């Protein structure tokens, strides 16, 4: 257990210690080879919140501005400060810099108990190394252990890389999701976003 704690840390602000069971030796090797460690928070202190916000702004501002939502710094920060949100944060060991995070809440969506993912954000230099998959896997296992039957998330229709990523892991549009509009001419108008969901599971 001491070896595991070198890579996944807990405090009174973070998740319950029994959830350390989610971490396997395979996880430890994965994190070690990446040169990162993970911390899981129920609440972010101001400095770390700003780091998470900066990563979202860097990765997502352009997509927000292309949509009908637009981008507003203060509104996004307000959303990220919500007490119900929990964060899985990934830090680089050498620089101690935040390089990625996943934020989520336990909730009910369309009458289904679920873990709702708000953000999966990665710094560009850590992409393509299965970190997104690792975060999604552990979110799914966490949902399963909390008896949350489903995982929900919202994704911009213009974010094709994200759509392909989620489809690969069996996410499909929920019936409550905005739908495409198809015209007789063959023209298709995509909504700004889709609501995707899948069942939580303990095995990946």
Swiss-Prot record:
Reactions catalysed, as given in the entry: N-terminal L-seryl-[histone H4] + acetyl-CoA = N-terminal N(alpha)-acetyl-L-seryl-[histone H4] + CoA + H(+); N-terminal L-seryl-[histone H2A] + acetyl-CoA = N-terminal N(alpha)-acetyl-L-seryl-[histone H2A] + CoA + H(+)
Binding locations of substrate: 64, 107-109, 118, 154, 176
Binding locations of acetyl-CoA: 120-122, 128-133, 159
Gene3D superfamilies tied to this protein: 3.40.630.30
Leading EC class: transferase
PANTHER family: N-ALPHA-ACETYLTRANSFERASE 40
Protein name as catalogued: N-alpha-acetyltransferase 40
């Amino acid at each position: 257990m001491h070896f595991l704690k070198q890579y996944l840390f807990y405090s009174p602000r973070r998740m319950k210690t029994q959830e350390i069971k989610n971490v396997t030796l395979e996880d430890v090797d994965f994190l070690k080879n990446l040169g990162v460690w993970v911390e899981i928070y129920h609440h972010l202190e101001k400095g770390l919140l700003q780091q998470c916000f900066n990563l979202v702004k860097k990765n997502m501002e352009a997509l927000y501005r292309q949509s009908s939502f637009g981008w507003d710094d203060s509104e996004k920060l307000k959303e990220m400060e919500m007490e119900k949100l929990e964060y899985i944060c990934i830090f680089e060991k050498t620089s101690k810099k935040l390089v990625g995070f996943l934020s989520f809440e336990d909730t009910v969506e369309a009458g289904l108990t679920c873990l709702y993912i708000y953000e999966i954000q990665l710094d560009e230099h850590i992409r393509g190394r299965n970190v997104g998959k690792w975060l999604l896997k552990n979110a799914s296992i966490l949902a399963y252990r909390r008896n949350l039957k489903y995982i929900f998330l919202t994704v911009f229709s213009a974010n094709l890389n994200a759509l392909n990523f989620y489809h690969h892991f069996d996410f499909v549009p929920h019936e409550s999701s905005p739908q495409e509009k198809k015209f007789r001419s063959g023209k298709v108008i995509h909504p700004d976003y889709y609501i995707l969901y899948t069942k939580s599971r303990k095995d990946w």
